[in-house]
Amino acid sequence: PITSRCLECHVTYAEGSGGDTLEPVNFSRDKIIYGVSCEKCHGPAAKHVEYQTGNPAVKTAKYVINPAKLSRQQQLDVCAVCHAGKMQKIKPSFQFVPGKNLADYFILDSVHNSSLAGGEVEVHGNQYGLLRKSKCFTATSTMTCSSCHNTHENQRGEAA
């Protein structure tokens, strides 16, 4: 079955019916933002879109999160919400937004770390955990996922 945890990574937002339960079973099809859009990394954008639409000459983004301006851990959390392997939810689905601390919403599963099959990272593996254990990461205090990956470009099949 497709769970709210699946949707948290494969759609930008989905509203569960029946209130804010930890694991809603039903979702309103008309209240799903399909795909992974800007809001997944930049947070809710209604106020941003309204402002920019009314002020097209303003080139500085307002009312939207710039992940590059977040702390290192908050930047990592933006990616880890979908790339940290199994996590136990402690708050309802779709409550985490960029700039918040992931540990307030999920408990990372340190027991089931990502397995390497033939040298490849499993799709639902713990890329976050692998990064944190890498020599590159531990040698610096500034490395984040975006040090090697550009989320604004399709980089499928490319080595980091």
Please report, for each region that a protein language model flagged, where it lies by residue.
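Parallel beta-helix/beta-solenoid
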Residues: 2-13
